[in-house]
Swiss-Prot record:
The keyword NAD does not apply. The alpha subunit is responsible for the aldol cleavage of indoleglycerol phosphate to indole and glyceraldehyde 3-phosphate. Pathway: Amino-acid biosynthesis; L-tryptophan biosynthesis; L-tryptophan from chorismate: step 5/5. GO terms for molecular function: tryptophan synthase activity. This is Tryptophan synthase alpha chain. It comes from the Bacteria. PANTHER family: TRYPTOPHAN SYNTHASE ALPHA CHAIN, CHLOROPLASTIC, TRYPTOPHAN SYNTHASE, ALPHA CHAIN. It is an enzyme of class 4 (lyase). GO terms for cellular component: cytosol. It comes from Azorhizobium caulinodans (strain ATCC 43989 / DSM 5975 / JCM 20966 / LMG 6465 / NBRC 14845 / NCIMB 13405 / ORS 571). Tetramer of two alpha and two beta chains. It catalyses: (1S,2R)-1-C-(indol-3-yl)glycerol 3-phosphate + L-serine = D-glyceraldehyde 3-phosphate + L-tryptophan + H2O.
């Protein structure tokens, strides 16, 4: 069965353009505002959406996404409510792929079989669980794949030729290439180095490769997208939320428009990249 993720990247390849993958934190700064942002992303130009599951100890995330997670948790966001958000989104949109991104602990506490069943029923298409290595595939990856959920793995600049086959073995949907060593939203990736890394990964897989971590501006997104099948932007969108909050950390009338406006700028830049010309 073709997942929404595979279908979307097939469409993008046929159009000869890279995709824009956007990340938001579920429940940031509150459930209703986050749902409004989620619903506005496709029209603004997001091709694939990652929804972050808030967690108290997000080791791979930088200050922006850590703060967003804490805002969401303070507002009462849970894994169950995150699935509710996706379900509500699916009431209006049945085509845009949604990937849940987070850490294993909340899923483990929720219960793996229950989580897989509920995620599938809610309309989730894929999972990125950053702290589950390939050696733990039996925990979540293989059951998720059996249920028809794509399991997306991270490859990094330190993933060498010996390690890469293990990383790719059960990866489905796309490969997420982490363009920098470190946490999200920190350094700025080098477009030429990224293009070389993507080419190296593609020697081992036919899956599309999306690149994230450190991509903040439309110009950076376009430069990275020229050498990849997709570019992921997260910290910049989360920061757009933060900058519009009032002194109590609550959403304002500017919160949703600020995020969708930035996504429109990013999408315009990424859609201006012609993959055929770049290759």
């Amino acid at each position: 069965m073709t997942t929404r993720i595979t279908a979307r990247f097939t469409e993008l390849a046929a159009e000869g353009r890279p995709g824009l993958v956007t990340f938001i934190t579920a429940g940031d700064p509150d459930y209703d505002t986050a749902l409004s942002i989620l619903r506005g992303l496709p029209e603004a130009g997001a091709d694939v959406i990652e929804v972050g599951i808030p967690f108290t100890d997000p080791m791979a995330d930088g200050p922006a996404i850590q703060a967003a997670g804490l805002r969401a948790l303070k507002g009462g966001q849970t894994l169950a409510k995150t699935l509710d958000m996706v379900r509500a989104f699916r009431d209006e949109n049945d085509t845009t792929p949604v990937v849940l991104m987070g850490y294993y602990n909340p899923i483990y506490i929720y219960g793996v079989p229950r989580f897989i069943a509920d995620a599938k029923a809610a309309g989730v298409d894929g999972l990125i669980v950053v702290d589950l290595p390939p050696e733990e595939d039996n925990e979540l990856c293989l059951p998720a794949l059996d249920a028809g959920l794509d399991f997306i793995r991270l490859a990094t600049p330190t993933t060498d030729e010996k390690r890469l086959p293990a990383v790719l073995a059960h990866t489905a949907g796309f490969v997420y290439y982490v363009s920098i060593t470190g946490i999200t939203g920190s350094a700025t990736p080098d477009a030429n180095a990224v293009a070389g890394a993507v080419a190296r990964i593609k020697q081992h897989t036919t899956l599309p490769v999306a690149v994230g971590f450190g991509v903040k501006t439309p110009a950076q997104a376009a430069a990275i997208a020229a050498g990849a099948d997709g570019v992921v932007v997260g910290s910049a969108l989360v920061e757009a939320v933060r900058k519009t909050l009032d002194e109590d950390g609550k959403a304002t009338v500017n919160t949703v428009p600020a995020v969708t406006a930035l996504v429109q700028e990013l999408a315009e830049a990424v859609r201006g990249v012609n993959r055929a010309a770049a290759e």
